[in-house]
Amino acid sequence: ETADEYLSGNVRDKLRLANAVVKEHPELFADNVTALEQVQPKDLDASEIDVRIGTTWIEPEDYEAFIFELLDTPRRSRAVRSTYYSSGIQIHLNKYTMEWFIENKSYDKSSVAASKTYGTSRMDAYTIFETTLNLRTVTVRDRIEDGDGRYHYEINQKETMLAREKQNQMKEAFKEWIFAEPERRNKYVNYYNET
């Protein structure tokens, strides 16, 4: 590996490795540590980090906390997890497909916040949030009967526009929320700067 290649990429991990090895072989790796220290990127603060809904390094529990706070989800509908039992609205990331899904989202879809404030009559807020987690833009389609048991779907422009407006409101609310609480801000700023 050339010097340019060595001093690029994930230089934080390379420095950690070089620091571990230099203890046993200082004569071989002291120059590596010095060179890697000089190319370390500066840490960013929260205002310099752009986090979107759907970022996979945000923990599912934090996405749950956000949506529960935003929609004022009733306690009885919120996620409950233990070794032997789980219930309520829960957000999961499928590690194989890297798709997010919200389990039991129907528990609260009729609340005013879920159906009107951040949702529409055609698409509730939990469905909009799940679509947003998967980095997709919401689209509302109407089923059109063609006769003989056949049908097709057409985009409903008006309902799609309303749902996208709600989606954008959620995105803006998340940007304000994610770094608002100091402990959560520190956790994700540190994670971002270390990877």
Task: State what each model feature region is.
Residues 194-195:
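ASCE P-loop NTPase motor core, strongest for the SF2 helicase catalytic module
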Residues 1-191:
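Charged, low-complexity intrinsically disordered regions
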